């Protein structure tokens, strides 16, 4: 049982879309250095698009970027977004690169479902599991449905919310994994277990937050079209019905930076790494967000 803090209040530094290249790795590391110094997190989470183009040596770039965390002995974990597939590296091989970097917390991985970085990390303090951090792999585009289901090539999938991307997010098999695994863990524990979700591509429910600002207690900035998934895998509904998920935190968008309340949960969309990161302080029942602008 890995202890992440004492007292049961965890500090999570969440960032996405670092998009590392040989040209920007050192500058990105300097930015992360400042963020780590300001946030003093118990755990850092790379929430997708750490890479988004072909690169010669991802391990070296990742080691450079994460140097500030390594030097401070800050553990970190990760989930893949759509950018990781653009490296041209098979996901299993790229996953092994991430795992090889010091400080990586791999978590308890799910087998037999879509993606390689679906994982659960029990967040422990003082010998107890305070909540579960659940990571989902959202590496696909909706064009993948052409091969899987024979849908028309590159046709826009109609959806009530406008999204200018062909994004696919958490799929039904991943939603079913959460439902099965969560029930099993609660039964084994003998009591409900709180969860916090982190994955790259926002859900359609995230896009509802800025459209209903008063009702959802909107906080932040909404200044670009939503890049939410256009095929709804049902993860928000499953989370709400469980009554055990406190927050669903996503990325993928560039400058949108907001959170709000939906069905008793906090739904949040973080800006890309170039614009900042979030320090999320939580005991598993509620999440407080502080924006880091290093």
Across the structure, where does each feature detected by a protein language model lie?
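N-terminal active-site segment of His-dependent metallophosphoesterases
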Residues: 1-70
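Binuclear metal-dependent phosphoesterase catalytic core
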Residues: 2-3, 118-128, 133-135, 226-227, ...
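Extended active-site neighborhood of metal-dependent phosphoesterases/phosphodiesterases
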Residues: 2-4, 61-189, 278-281
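Active-site-proximal beta-strand elements of phosphoester/diester hydrolases
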Residues: 9-19, 130-144, 198, 266-272
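Acidic/histidine-rich helix-loop elements
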Residues: 15-29, 51-60, 86, 143-167, ...
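Divalent metal-coordination and catalytic microenvironments
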Residues: 17, 32, 44, 49, ...
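Active-site environment of divalent metal-dependent phosphoester hydrolases
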Residues: 20-22, 52-55, 78-90, 141-145, ...
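His/acidic metal-ligating clusters that form di-metal
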Residues: 39-43, 132-136, 148-253, 257
């Amino acid at each position: 049982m890995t202890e992440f803090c004492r007292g049961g209040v965890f500090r999570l530094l969440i960032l996405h879309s670092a998009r590392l290249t040989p040209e920007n790795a050192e500058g990105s590391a300097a930015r992360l250095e400042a963020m780590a110094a300001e946030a003093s997190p118990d755990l850092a989470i790379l929430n997708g698009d750490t890479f988004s183009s072909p690169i010669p040596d991802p391990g070296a770039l990742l080691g450079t970027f994460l140097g500030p965390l390594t030097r401070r002995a800050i553990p970190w974990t990760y989930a893949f977004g759509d950018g990781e597939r653009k490296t041209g590296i098979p996901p299993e091989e790229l996953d092994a690169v991430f795992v090889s970097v010091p400080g990586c917390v791999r978590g308890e991985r799910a087998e037999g479902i879509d993606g390689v970085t679906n994982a659960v990390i029990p967040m422990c303090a003082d010998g107890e599991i305070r909540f579960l951090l659940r990571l989902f792999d959202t590496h696909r585009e909706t064009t993948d449905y052409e091969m899987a289901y024979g849908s028309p090539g590159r046709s826009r999938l109609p959806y009530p919310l406008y999204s200018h991307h062909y994004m696919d997010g958490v799929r039904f098999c991943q939603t079913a994994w959460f439902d099965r695994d969560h029930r099993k863990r609660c039964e084994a524990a003998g009591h409900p277990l709180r969860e916090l979700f982190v994955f790259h591509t926002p859900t359609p429910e995230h896009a509802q937050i800025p459209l209903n600002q008063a009702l959802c207690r909107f906080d932040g900035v909404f200044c670009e079209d939503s890049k939410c998934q256009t095929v709804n895998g049902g993860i928000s509904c499953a989370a709400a019905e469980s009554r055990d998920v406190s927050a669903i935190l996503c990325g993928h968008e560039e400058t949108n930076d907001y959170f709000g309340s939906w069905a008793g949960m906090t739904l949040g969309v973080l800006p890309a790494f170039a614009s900042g990161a979030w320090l999320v302080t939580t005991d598993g029942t509620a999440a407080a967000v502080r924006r880091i602008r290093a």
